Amino acid sequence: MSQTRHVPVMLQRCLDLLAPALQDPAHPEPVVVDCTLGLGGHSEALLASFPTARLIALDRDKEALRLSGERLAPYGDRATLVHAVYDELPEVLARLGIPKVQGVLFDLGVSSMQLDEADRGFAYAQDAPLDMRMDQSTGMGAAEVLNTYPPGELVRILRAYGEEKQAKRIVSAVVREREKEPFSNSARLVELIRDALPQAAKRTGGNPAKRTFQALRIEVNGELSVLERAIPAAVDSLDVGGRIAVLSYHSLEDRLVKQVFAAGAANTAPPGLPVVPERYQPRLKQLTRGAELPTEQEVAENRRAAPARLRGAQRIRAEER
C-alpha cells in the first residue's frame, strides 16, 4: 500500500482546533491522543507541528499499526502506538499511567488503506471477499452477517445504519439468493442490489450499494456502539482546557458527536436558581458552529474528504470531587 495516496482530511483545521491546548504554557509536554491512527497522516502532522507533544495512537487494525509504526519511527519514543479499539481509551491511558490528556482526535470511518486493499471487502467498486472487519483477527465478517442473520434483523440494520429506504426489498432478494448459495464476494451483492432496486432509487445518491455496504460495515465493527462509549470517554480524559476534534463521515456518526457535545455544553441546573452551582455548569465549550465542512478545493484534490464533518469542543470544567 503506497502511503502517497493517503491524504489526511481537513488536516490544517484539525491542527488549528487542537493547537491552543497543545501550546498551553501550563502543559509544556502535552499528551495528544489519535484515536484512529490509520496510516498516520494526522499523527505525523501532530508530532511535527507540536514538537514537545507526546502522541498516544490507537488502532484496531494491526496492519495499520505496522505501516504507521514505520512512518512515525523518526519520532522515537514521542509516539506510543497501541492495538486497541477507541472505546478502550480509559484502559489504555490507565495502563500508561496518564491521568489526563490535552488533546484528542478522531477520524472516523474507513481508512484509505482499508478501502484500497481489495481483499478487505470494504469497497463496492471492486470484487472482494465480503469481510469488512477492521480487526481481521476477531469477530464475524460481512458474509456471515448476510448469510446467517434473520431477515427482520437485516432490515433493521439496513434502515438504522444505512438509512436505506429500500431495505425490505434488498433483504428479500438477499434471503432468496442466500438459500441458493451463501454470499462470499462483494460483486454478487452489488449486482443483487442493483437488480432489486426500482429504477427511481438508482438515479440518486451514487452507487446503489453504498448504503448497504455502510450498514454492514457498521454492524460488523460495532462502530456506533463503540462510538457511543468512546466520545464521552474521550471528553472525560481531557484536562481542563483540553480540546477534542472529531471528523465523521455520515449523519449517524455526526449526530452522535453533536449530541455528546451539546449535552456537555448545556447548563443542567433546575430553572429558577439565583446562582448556578458548579456541578450544573457546562463541562464543554463548543468550538465549531455546527459541523464544519471541507473546502471545495480540498474535495477537488481528495474526493474522500467530500462527506467529512468536523466538530470540536473544549473542556472547561473539571469533575466534581
UniProtKB/Swiss-Prot annotation:
GO terms, biological process: rRNA base methylation
Disulfide-bonded cysteines: none
Top-rank lineage group of the source organism: Bacteria
Enzyme Commission number(s): 2.1.1.199
Function text: Specifically methylates the N4 position of cytidine in position 1402 (C1402) of 16S rRNA.
The keyword Phosphoprotein appears for this protein: no
Subcellular localization(s) per the UniProt record: Cytoplasm
Protein name according to UniProt: Ribosomal RNA small subunit methyltransferase H
Listed SUPFAM superfamilies: Putative methyltransferase TM0872, insert domain, S-adenosyl-L-methionine-dependent methyltransferases
Protein family membership: Belongs to the methyltransferase superfamily. RsmH family.
Gene3D superfamilies membership: Putative methyltransferase TM0872, insert domain, Vaccinia Virus protein VP39
Renumbered residue ranges of the record's region Disordered: 292-321
Binding residues for S-adenosyl-L-methionine: G40, G41, H42, D59, L93, D107, Q114
Keywords: Cytoplasm, Methyltransferase, rRNA processing, S-adenosyl-L-methionine, Transferase
Catalytic activity: cytidine(1402) in 16S rRNA + S-adenosyl-L-methionine = N(4)-methylcytidine(1402) in 16S rRNA + S-adenosyl-L-homocysteine + H(+)
Gene Ontology molecular function: any one: rRNA (cytosine-N4-)-methyltransferase activity
PANTHER family in the cross-refs: 12S RRNA N4-METHYLCYTIDINE METHYLTRANSFERASE, S-ADENOSYL-METHYLTRANSFERASE MRAW
